[in-house]
Amino acid sequence: MCGRNSLFIEQADLETRFDAEVVADGGYTSRYNIAPGDDLHIITNETPDEIDRYHWGLIPFWADESEEGIINARSETADEKRVFEQAWESRPCLVPSSGFYEWKAPNGGPKQPYRIYREDDPAFAMAGLWDVWEGDDETIPCVTILTTEPNDLMNSIHDRMPVVLPQDAESGWLAADPDTRKDLCQPYPEDDLNAYEISTQVNNPGNDDPRVIEPLDHEQSGLGEFSSG
């Protein structure tokens, strides 16, 4: 799954990287610890030249009241689920990221958080689905992040990972038909990802500053930074 995200690239660099302009109310602020229920900056298929903020958690269209929503959708079965069916059919999006976080519980012990990132790309895109929930008194644009089977790097940490898109597939993801998009939902090549242990500061969403991404001292953490390559 993907239960925590970050995006701390400079706004000008973000706009250049995705050839899109930030239009979100409130502008853009670097975030080191984005939790479910927060807003994610995303790029939708309807406005591929804009970066806007959407509530992280897709709210079922039948919900009578707003709720946190569903933060992840399994790419293998999203088209079969009533809650995602319409979004899968016609509402793909890109979710920019500077790195996501995952927790590993070795031998049933305390969960150890990891930061997973691309060393050669200060911002990459995860695949998502967006929707707009409409209530009696409010309208909430919302998003869920798609997941897939883990690559070899992620397999040692968790049994799922977000769908990370190669840069040359990002525009295709937004424009493709549903069958083609499903073909793009593959584990990202492990040689292009790195991971390292971080402190449990990330466990508290209120900790949202650069200290969150600092590596643990290798002598204390045991595993340290690693990559499958």
Go through each PLM region and give its residues.
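Short linear sequence motif anchored by a di-proline
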Residues: 1-229
